[in-house]
Each structure stands twice: as structure tokens, then as C-alpha cells.
């Protein structure tokens, strides 16, 4: 039986790669943390749950379609969400974008009153949707997402522009159209214009603040 005193509220934020999901999640976390304290709110990125590929060569790892639901260990994520809701801590995997696999390290996460979950494929999995108290889809035009992705992956993840463009054409855009964009039908709130939509962020803050009352 779940201990209601530890009941964890899960808020899902989905959308295309480089749509502004992480910016919205980090802004909500930072501003709400100032109000309620770090012990009451946390963020979990879906990227942490990319499957372990340590058994594959680097050549094989780079061929993985990272925008397909099969690239994600949603079974483990689902298990972790259930544990947090039951008042139990989890060991969050740590994923290396350079090595294209999990590292040996984990991050200890204690249950929080509110967990903000963000990632591209969250709403494609019915089990994850069931665990969310409410969900958000960040709806940003693909051309803007591409420009942001090039800047981010080249500057922050050690990628070449050619590799980013090839991946975008082969997997990112097709998988967005096949899986991610259709999943926005499941969102409770759709946020246009990405992470700098201040009005939307204020509305979301007000909604999330209700869970701390």
C-alpha cells in the first residue's frame, strides 16, 4: 500500500528535440525550488534512460536510432516512477552523449513532492502517461528546433555539424513525425514557442504550486 505522506506528483514535459523542454523544466525547477526548497522538487531527464550499450562497439552505438522508443529503457523509468510514488529512493542512470552509453555512475534521487520529468518520447508510452499527474507538450517549429540542435550538439556534445545534419535527416525528423508529434494528443497542456514563453511558464508554475498547498 502506498504511503500517502510520500505521494509523489509526476509532471511530464515532452516535445521535439531542442524544442525548449529542458529550458522549461529547469526554469520551473529553479523558480519553484526558491519557494519550496530543494527537498520538495526535482527533475528527471528521459535521456538518462537511454539503454545501456556498453556491449556494443562505438561503430555500432553511433548507428542506434536514438529518436525511436526502442532506444529508451522505459521499463526501468516506469519502475523508478512507481518507486518514487511509493516513497522509495532510486538510482538514476547517468548517460554519456560522447560514449553513447551509460556510465558506471548513478545519481541517488530521494522521493520529492513534485518530480518534473522531461523528454522527447514520454507521451508515446501509455504506462508513463498513467503515472503522470499532468503532462505538457512543447510545440516548437522544426526549423527552429534544428537550429538549436546544431548549436547545442556541436558546442556541448562534441558533435560535427555534418553528423548532426545526417542524424536529423535520417532519424530525428522522421521519428518526430512518426512518434513524437502524434503523442501531443495526450498532453493536457500544449505550450507554443518553446522555453521562453513566459506566460506559459507562469501558468504552469501556478498549476504546480497547487500541489504544495
UniProtKB/Swiss-Prot annotation:
UniProt record, GO biological process: CTP salvage; UMP salvage
Sections of the chain in a coiled coil: none
InterPro entries reported in the protein's UniProt record: P-loop_NTPase, PRK/URK, Uridine_kinase, Uridine_kinase-like
EC number, as in UniProt: 2.7.1.48
Pathway connected to this protein: Pyrimidine metabolism; CTP biosynthesis via salvage pathway; CTP from cytidine: step 1/3; Pyrimidine metabolism; UMP biosynthesis via salvage pathway; UMP from uridine: step 1/1
Key words of the record: ATP-binding, Cytoplasm, Kinase, Nucleotide-binding, Transferase
Any one GO MF annotation of this record: ATP binding
Catalytic activity entry: uridine + ATP = UMP + ADP + H(+); cytidine + ATP = CMP + ADP + H(+)
Compartment(s): Cytoplasm
Keyword Transmembrane helix attached: no
GO cellular component, one term: cytoplasm
Ranges annotated as spanning the membrane: none
PANTHER family from the UniProt entry: URIDINE KINASE (PTHR10285)
Family: Belongs to the uridine kinase family.
This protein's name: Uridine kinase
Native source organism of the sequence: Cronobacter sakazakii (strain ATCC BAA-894)
